[in-house]
């Protein structure tokens, strides 16, 4: 049985770690390489860097952070934010990223996913799906893809899009509820489950963790293969080891460090 992965996520802006509530209101929580080393020591299964500057000028800063992290850490590293071209992906992989997450570029052109998967292999292509619930009370649940940090509606159904990009070669999906992100009220389990049940690739639940029970629910009820969290780890409310022990106690298969 595949073990459930626990993945801390570091939002990086101008080479520094920040954690915003719903992508705004940024708090400086330190140096990304130091934070990554701490998570590596703490037994994180993977680490995710999300570059929220993603401007072209800041690209070199991000590549430097990725390179220094890859040199210092053994856990797999996924990097996303501002990935628009095959060259962007190549540069991140050469800098030491294990996987690259594509967001808006995949929404604008799902064939980009196929091109990337063909060149680099599906195993290192993650598609990030940022979605909001758009169904009204009493209607069957429906979620729509939003871009630009949740500000721009696309009209694209999130579950249909998940099927599309998986068919194009995405090896993994990072599913974030924009309604829940930063709200600490738990994952949108309906969204996570709807996508996980619709595709054959691993789904990472993201957006809204307020406590360790939320991580359990992401897997047990959301059918996710991995759980991503930021605030509860960054600000010391729980350790990765505590998260894994809590999940294992709930009956989930975890990689527990000796």
Curated annotation (Swiss-Prot):
Keyword Ribonucleoprotein found: no
Family per similarity comment: Belongs to the HisA/HisF family.
Enzyme Commission number(s) of this protein: 4.3.2.10
Subunit structure, as described in the record: Heterodimer of HisH and HisF.
GO biological process: L-histidine biosynthetic process
Protein name, per record: Imidazole glycerol phosphate synthase subunit HisF
The protein's annotated pathway: Amino-acid biosynthesis; L-histidine biosynthesis; L-histidine from 5-phospho-alpha-D-ribose 1-diphosphate: step 5/9
Function field: IGPS catalyzes the conversion of PRFAR and glutamine to IGP, AICAR and glutamate. The HisF subunit catalyzes the cyclization activity that produces IGP and AICAR from PRFAR using the ammonia provided by the HisH subunit.
Species of origin: Methylobacterium nodulans (strain LMG 21967 / CNCM I-2342 / ORS 2060)
SUPFAM superfamilies hit by this protein: Ribulose-phoshate binding barrel
UniProt keyword annotations, A-Z: Amino-acid biosynthesis, Cytoplasm, Histidine biosynthesis, Lyase
CDD domains from the UniProt entry: HisF (cd04731)
Catalytic activity: 5-[(5-phospho-1-deoxy-D-ribulos-1-ylimino)methylamino]-1-(5-phospho-beta-D-ribosyl)imidazole-4-carboxamide + L-glutamine = D-erythro-1-(imidazol-4-yl)glycerol 3-phosphate + 5-amino-1-(5-phospho-beta-D-ribosyl)imidazole-4-carboxamide + L-glutamate + H(+)
GO cellular component: cytoplasm
Secretion signal, residue range per the UniProt entry: none
